[in-house]
Curated annotation (Swiss-Prot):
Origin: domain of life: Viruses
Encoding gene, per UniProt annotation: DNA-M
Statement: the UniProt record of this protein carries the keyword DNA-binding: no
Organism: Milk vetch dwarf virus (isolate N)
Source taxonomy: Viruses, Monodnaviria, Shotokuvirae, Cressdnaviricota, Arfiviricetes
Signal peptide: none
Identification of the protein by name: Putative movement protein
Biased composition (Polar residues): 98-112
Compositionally biased intervals (Basic and acidic residues): 86-97
Amino acid sequence: MADPVYYQGYQDDGDIDAQKRHQALYLIGIIILIMVCIIILWVCIMLACYIPGFLKKTMEAWLSSSSMMKRRVAATITRTPFEATGPERERNWDARRQTNAASSQPSNGGVF
């Protein structure tokens, strides 16, 4: 059995080791958090650069597509019947404008 006074240089550093481990884990956590934030920022920048190009290509493809597709999209967006989105609509535009102008004419019987 060893004599307790045999080696005087060793001391029980249980509390100091626990504190060092805690600091090391805290430092590792901060480093991982910074890396995650950098990755999220990089993904946001990549999306911000990709989305306008994607929209441009999509709009160019849509503009070069058939008018049938454009009519379907216009009917969906404006919630008008599909039949009302064709060339007849353009021809009837003047007639609708005239009926709207006639109905919005003020009557002379008003006070103002």
